[in-house]
Design a protein with these regions (language model features):
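Early extracytoplasmic/lumenal segment of secretory-pathway proteins
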Residues: 30-96
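A ligand-binding cleft/hinge motif common to bilobed small-molecule-binding domains
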Residues: 92-99, 220, 225-244
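Periplasmic-binding protein-like
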Residues: 114, 197-202, 208-209, 241-265, ...
Length: 345
């Protein structure tokens, strides 16, 4: 097949951008009207539509960034002597650990006081901006006639071999959050991950797909028929993208998890980072999250986005979603990651 000049040019540009890697972020960081926010992929949690709103409302351009939480923290550590990022969007356990490593600046800005105490660091090191519930995102057409699974244990049936996917628990926060959810549902605690490790050992025998980056598009395409993910992704897929997706809150139980933002220590454009955090916690920012099926941390879902709220599963289903001690979840994350990697050998 012969490429047109235009197609060749596109491929050449894509390759150049890929090879530039994190250097591209450094180029963006040089612009005073930009803020670098690590971990804001277009396909994840409404960021694709939020970034243009931030630009329109604040004048600050935030380029898309495809890192996951673990990769973001690793990059911040690597750049500690010459920071590139101004802020980061992280799973809560990664943010707690980032604070403990001295990687972030305290900031109590507009909207911070309105966030419930359990969803923000008392010193201002991080603040939750929205939350989601862990469950199963199921592409019903890709099941090839198999029944929609109702719980975690159903996926250990060999008939689902090769159909299940989850993000790498040792790197991506959603992978770790799903592991905590499985463990919680199957009788484990944050001091005993035995149930989750046993579960993943059994699931590993059925050829699961374990990517490191968001796998939203791969579930929509049917490549991953059953994905451990959040409710907000499943609802967006079904109601915004028109995909044959159902969200399942496992019968054994699950957890609800907040995502947070933090200001990077010695950020090159710290004021821009602060303004971005202020905006996502504003009424307009929280309304946007709610309209994208995320649980807001300031205001009520039903009031901010009544039409979106109607599309959630019934409240009785969400009664199976509990919470955990997020500080303890952060403390045991490294030990779990090491145990998980050992178990998968």
């Amino acid at each position: 097949m012969t490429l047109s000049r235009r197609a060749f040019g596109r491929n050449l540009l894509a390759t150049a951008l890929l090879m530039q890697g994190f250097g591209l972020s450094r180029a963006f960081a040089a612009d005073p009207q930009r803020a670098i926010v690590y971990n804001c992929p277009a396909e994840w949690a409404g960021w694709g539509s939020m970034l243009p709103i931030i630009k329109a409302e604040t004048g600050i351009e935030v380029p898309m960034d495809n890192k996951n939480s673990g990769q973001s923290v690793s990059q911040i550590i690597a750049e500690a002597n010459n920071p590139v990022a101004d802020a980061a969007y992280l799973g809560i356990s990664f943010a707690i650990n980032a604070k403990n490593q001295g990687l972030v600046e305290n900031y109590k800005g507009e909207g911070w006081q309105k966030v419930p105490a359990g969803l923000k660091d008392p010193d201002g090191a991080w603040v939750s901006i929205h939350a989601g519930t862990v469950g199963l995102m199921v592409n019903t057409e890709a099941l090839d006639g198999l029944p929609v699974p109702k719980g975690w244990k159903d996926l250990l049936d060999p008939k689902y071999e090769g159909m299940v996917g989850f993000l790498d628990p040792s790197s991506a926060f959603v992978g770790y959050a799903c592991s905590v959810a499985v463990n919680h549902a199957l009788g484990g605690t944050l001091d005993d991950f035995g149930p989750a490790l046993d579960y993943f050992k059994k699931l590993n025998e059925l050829s699961p797909i374990v990517p490191k980056q968001t796998a939203y598009a791969r579930c929509l395409s049917g490549e991953i028929p059953i994905l451990f993910d959040y409710d907000f992704d499943a609802y967006r897929a079904k109601y915004a993208d028109g995909a044959p997706i159902e969200f399942v809150i496992p019968v054994e139980g699950t957890i609800q998890v907040p995502y947070v933002m933090t200001l990077v220590k010695n950020a090159p454009h710290a004021e821009n980072g602060r303004r971005v955090i202020d905006f996502v916690l504003s009424e307009k920012g929280q309304k946007h999250w709610a309209e994208n099926f995320l649980r807001p941390v300031v205001g009520d879902l039903e009031k901010l986005a009544p039409e979106a709220a109607k599309k959630f599963l019934p409240a009785s289903e969400y009664e199976r979603a509990g919470s955990v001690d997020y500080a303890r979840m952060a403390e045991v994350q490294r030990a779990f990651s090491e145990a998980y990697l050992q178990a998968m050998k």
